[in-house]
């Protein structure tokens, strides 16, 4: 199975697998059962921003979700990613819909990782930034139903020609280049990721959610990982 670390924006509470009984953001370490969650006042039809950061000194993974003009939601969890992830990974975004649905539209996405060592070549870093997504992106690996549209947005799950969300959809987008996320001799390994998103839904209860995730480089969508498993996990263990 893939090794996954993720930050989830979970719009639909699945209390049977340990979700709190409200929309929430959470940090997932190798399981969809979040290690830490915070209540998320989700606003459909409004653009939101997610900022995720980690550094190996504090060993704290944290995420902040905000909408302009309203208060933000923060979640964090202390974890040593050296002990969880392989040295080389890919970073991606995933989303799913189920019986209930929502658009999982990504408007922009940026990422920076840095490895500081004591050697001569002091810093090894990777940076990318998408402010618009091209129609046939060469620098993204699109999986499942993910596609880019003529407006320059990334649609992680299926939408109709009129832009309405479709049910039972799963899609992911990964940056094409592997990321050197940690190294034995690194003094500090850190990363920052930011993305903006738009969730719209005709349903009273939108579903299912969007994630930012880090995984082994050959990661694929696990069979049966739709809906509440957010395109990341084969089961709810």
Curated annotation (Swiss-Prot):
MF-aspect GO terms: calcium ion binding; D-mannose binding; manganese ion binding
Positions annotated to bind Mn(2+): 8, 10, 19, 24
Temperature dependence as stated in the record: Hemagglutinating activity is stable up to 50 degrees Celsius and is lost after incubation for 1 hour at 80 degrees Celsius.
Electron transport listed as a keyword: no
Gene3D superfamilies: 2.60.120.200
Keywords, alphabetical: Calcium, Hemagglutinin, Lectin, Manganese, Mannose-binding, Metal-binding
PTM statement from Swiss-Prot or TrEMBL: Concanavalin A-like lectins of the Diocleinae subtribe undergo proteolytic processing referred to as circular permutation. The propeptide is split into an N-terminal and a C-terminal part, the gamma and beta chain, respectively. These are then religated in beta-gamma order to form the mature alpha chain. The beta and gamma chains can often be detected in cell extracts. Residues 1-118 of the mature chain, as displayed here, probably constitute the beta chain in the propeptide, residues 119-237 the gamma chain.
Binding of Ca(2+), residues: 10, 12, 14, 19, 208
Entries under InterPro entries matching the protein: ConA-like_dom_sf, Lectin_LegA_CS, Lectin_legB_Mn/Ca_BS, Legume_lectin_dom, Leguminous_Lectin
pH dependence remark: Optimum pH for hemagglutinating activity is between pH 5 and pH 7. Activity quickly decreases outside this range.
Pfam families in the record: Lectin_legB
Binding sites annotated in the UniProt record for a carbohydrate: 12, 14, 98-100, 227-228
Family: Belongs to the leguminous lectin family.
PANTHER family, sorted: CONCANAVALIN A-LIKE LECTIN FAMILY PROTEIN, LEGUME LECTIN DOMAIN-CONTAINING PROTEIN
Extra remark: Binds one manganese (or another transition metal) ion and one calcium ion. The metal ions are essential for the saccharide-binding and cell-agglutinating activities.
Quaternary structure (record): Homotetramer; dimer of dimers.
Function as written in the Swiss-Prot or TrEMBL entry: D-mannose/D-glucose-binding lectin with hemagglutinating activity towards rabbit and human erythrocytes. In rats, induces dose-dependent paw edema. Has low cytotoxicity against Artemisia sp.
Name the UniProt record assigns to this protein: Lectin
């Amino acid at each position: 199975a893939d090794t996954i670390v993720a930050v989830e924006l979970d719009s639909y509470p699945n209390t049977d697998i340990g979700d709190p009984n409200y929309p929430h953001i959470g940090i997932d370490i190798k399981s969809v059962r979040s290690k830490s969650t915070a209540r998320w006042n989700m606003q459909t039809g409004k653009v939101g921003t997610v900022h995720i950061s980690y550094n190996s000194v504090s060993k704290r993974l944290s995420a902040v979700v905000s909408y302009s003009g309203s208060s933000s939601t923060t979640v964090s969890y202390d974890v040593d990613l050296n002990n969880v992830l392989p040295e080389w990974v890919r970073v991606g975004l995933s989303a799913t819909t189920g019986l209930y649905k929502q658009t999982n539209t990504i408007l922009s996405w940026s990422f920076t990782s840095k490895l500081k060592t004591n050697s001569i070549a002091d810093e090894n870093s990777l940076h990318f930034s998408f402010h618009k997504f091209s129609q046939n992106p060469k620098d993204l690996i699109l999986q499942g139903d993910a596609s880019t549209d003529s407006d320059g947005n990334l649609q992680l799950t299926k939408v109709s020609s009129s832009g309405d969300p479709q049910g039972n959809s799963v899609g992911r987008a990964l940056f094409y280049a592997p990321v050197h996320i940690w190294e034995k001799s690194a003094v500090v390994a850190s990363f920052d990721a930011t993305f903006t998103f738009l969730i719209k839904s005709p349903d009273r209860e939108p579903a299912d959610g969007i994630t930012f995730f880090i995984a082994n480089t050959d990661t694929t969508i696990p069979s049966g990982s739709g809906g509440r498993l957010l395109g990341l996990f084969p089961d709810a263990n």
